[in-house]
């Protein structure tokens, strides 16, 4: 290990040794080693050296340069802006120009992006990021001060940005300092091992110092990404040209990019089949079926942590009784739903957020028995809770993607156990609402589509911790809060797995949210598109993508 000490901190070397032992003993797969190592900033050659592997070598066609890649995405709500961005579609529009600090890979690892390296202190309460030397479109140098200025705006309690919810209790406003032109030090509110993921995933886009809301739509935000915005129309889409000054321009083979907006998945699928677009970063499973049979297209897939929550507010009857929540959980045939909606191309859930896409999943699965359908047990629990004659409830949700089909199956399956569920499906705009009218947060019984997150903590912090801003189930558990926060701050991989088991077990037992499955990312592409990333669903890194025409 001595040869690596000049390249990594003592903490990284120590944890690297632990990862090596786990990998050599067979307790950890190659994928798990990549994920757990990359969050500490360990490079792939370093990780490969631990157990004697390097990056796999495959015989691949030589990339061709040129051409414009056309993508179809769901229409964003309103004008896209980095200050208010919250959805995948908005992220797809922003990220070609305003890229992430780290590039999240389909296998869950984190590759350098605008940040070329990162490291933490011994207890993961302080993180140091070193940024690449780059320049904005106007020729101004990109520096650590740009990131600090963006955070000043994004984390300001008065800001319109939703970004603050993901940082709550982790990083406070102004708790970071520029130590030199390319270095920024983050001083966290608590230990957080996955912090590099927090600043790298989702719809957050890093804009230049002096940015004013609305500048992006006006074409005034010349970014440091692989592409430069040429034209943006809120009702149609956006076009881009290659950025010749991008730090990795040699691996950007496309001359340009065009993003076209669509109102529904069926329209996107038809556009792909008709040649209007070349690839679809996200598509509902029901719309994928017809494409699967067409030899001109390929459907790329990757595991994801995205799920449709079936959540119950635990602070009022009938769902304040854990037995009612458990009864509904036992009434559902999870594998049947996965087979019916996804043709088996999804992972069965077990009422906790530690999805198979996460490195801790194997440990959790080994320790926590899978909940399966048991109608008799469901009826017994419902009777014990005082509902021997059954229970009538209204389930409020959104008319979006696969959600209606999913809830109709839940409605049908739960009936056998005594649940009489009435569905109230609203438009997405009405379900999420605004201000004091947000049904997804206020309705006693609801179902929400939660997009993937890069880490378990990124799922837990905004939605499951006591008092969290998007805690739609009103769940509050001191034991869970303690386990989840300890997990976030534990640097030892073995101890961290144990804490993941503790947190997952509490959620599974309390079941504020039924998580039936984790949907895989499905990306249909024309076969002329080469090197297109299979995932993750919320990111679109076009490094190495090219057109075989």
Language-model region placement:
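N-terminal secretory signal peptides
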Residues: 1-32
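Alpha-helical secondary-structure segments
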Residues: 70, 143-152, 181-187, 225-226, ...
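N-terminal lobe/hinge region of extracytoplasmic solute-binding protein
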Residues: 72-122, 152, 220-224
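Gly/Pro-rich hinge or "lid" segments in bacterial periplasmic/extracellular proteins
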Residues: 105-109, 191-192, 197-256, 264-266, ...
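Surface-exposed binding/hinge segments that line
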Residues: 130, 163-209
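Ligand-site clamp/hinge motif
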Residues: 245-290, 420
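Structural transition elements
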Residues: 347-384, 402-405
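Extracytoplasmic/peripheral linker and loop segments enriched in polar/acidic and small residues
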Residues: 371-372, 422-431, 458-527, 549
